[in-house]
């Protein structure tokens, strides 16, 4: 019998760095396998799951821009990096017999389906794992903003933000400030006013305007994705 989750449909946001593990660069097969196993476990429950992956383990558009590259070109390179991560995750999921589709905002029909909202929803209804890649298809927008937009479009109940270096939202960097306090609950407006670096302000404002809750948690602890889907109190919950 399938376990009952708190949410019917979720968007899982993974940073590219989370897929690199301690190496900090590239794709760590052990991490990908662990994430895939956790996602596959959730997919077997009564919960529909979409995944959005960043590309910072391969390329960061802002870094290229800071070094003098054209910002648009640098951002498009970052979008391609997210596709590489998405294909790696898809392969790992399919090795676990988990039906998966990659949908990209930039057409590349040889490797993935183009993003169409109704098609994405249909895949989710058929209990397929959907991986969104290539951001929103436009430069100057982060994958955090992609997560917020796609969550609204597919009417997800929550965005689960899996982090690799922190287990929630703190008042300051806990690695630098030993007096940093971990928040169990925040509002979107608090997050914006206090400048807490959970996601960029565009994404945060979008979540606030569209009443999309977030759960920020550590992806590095085995089983945390399932715990988040079950509604267990892990990490930090951010609501309107």
Swiss-Prot record:
Belongs to the UMP kinase family. One of its GO terms (biological process) is UDP biosynthetic process. Pfam families: AA_kinase. The lineage of its organism: Bacteria, Bacillati, Bacillota, Bacilli, Bacillales. Its main location: cytoplasm. It comes from the Bacteria. InterPro entries: AceGlu_kinase-like_sf (IPR036393), Asp/Glu/Uridylate_kinase (IPR001048), Uridylate_kinase (IPR011817), Uridylate_kinase_bac (IPR015963). UMP binds at residues 55, 75, 136-143. NCBIfam families: pyrH_bact. Pathway: Pyrimidine metabolism; CTP biosynthesis via de novo pathway; UDP from UMP (UMPK route): step 1/1. GO terms for molecular function: ATP binding; UMP kinase activity. Keywords: Allosteric enzyme, ATP-binding, Cytoplasm, Kinase, Nucleotide-binding, Pyrimidine biosynthesis, Transferase. Homohexamer. It catalyses: UMP + ATP = UDP + ADP. Its EC number is 2.7.4.22. This is Uridylate kinase. ATP binds at residues 13-16, 56, 60, 164, 170, 173. Catalyzes the reversible phosphorylation of UMP to UDP. One of its GO terms (cellular component) is cytoplasm. Residues 21-26 are annotated as: Involved in allosteric activation by GTP. It comes from Staphylococcus aureus (strain NCTC 8325 / PS 47). It is found in: Cytoplasm. Allosterically activated by GTP. Probably inhibited by UTP.
